[in-house]
Amino acid sequence: ASPVVCEDGGIRLGAWIRDSMAGVGTLTYYDPATGSYGALGHGITDVDTAELMPLASGSIMETMVKAVKKGQRGDPGELKGDFTVQRDVGTVTVNSNEGIFGTVEDAGFISGEAVSVAEPEEVHAGEASILCTISGSDTRAYEVEILRVNPRSRDGRDLLLRVTDPELLETTGGIVQGMSGSPILQDGRLVGAVTHVLVANPAEG
């Protein structure tokens, strides 16, 4: 920004400042050996400029999903939740186009069995599942179908999937805001994360 000389002779400088952001997202993976995690599957961007936000520091908290705004064609839905603000459970040290990354400091909220990570050539079109929370803190697996795999995609959107689970479709309409980062599992392995929803068809992303 450049200063401007006003009519009264004074010099003025306008500045748009945003010092913090908060939102609901989903943890993609946690490595108990290192305490590291990845989440969101995409970066945190400024809501006005769509530019990646520079990060000085950040934290993650547990969230209770209280309500769901169901997605419809042309109108993306949303998970609405309350943060457990009594304590942070980890730090955010990296905000990148591939997601946010950091360290989990209190893993008491994490449960489930460990899975291996698939090699890119092992991912294929067909049945799969995503893990997400659409009520309270209950994380469940929901059925999806991988329609297309494009490992050479330059925008990081390496596959196209469609939600096929009747319960998830009934409750959310498909993929909604807040599900970003939901792990995609196929053949017992982690193959990716949900990153975006197709606005024209919320069942796909």
Q: What residues fall within each predicted segment?
A:
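C-terminal recognition in membrane/secretory proteostasis and scaffolding
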Residues: 1-205
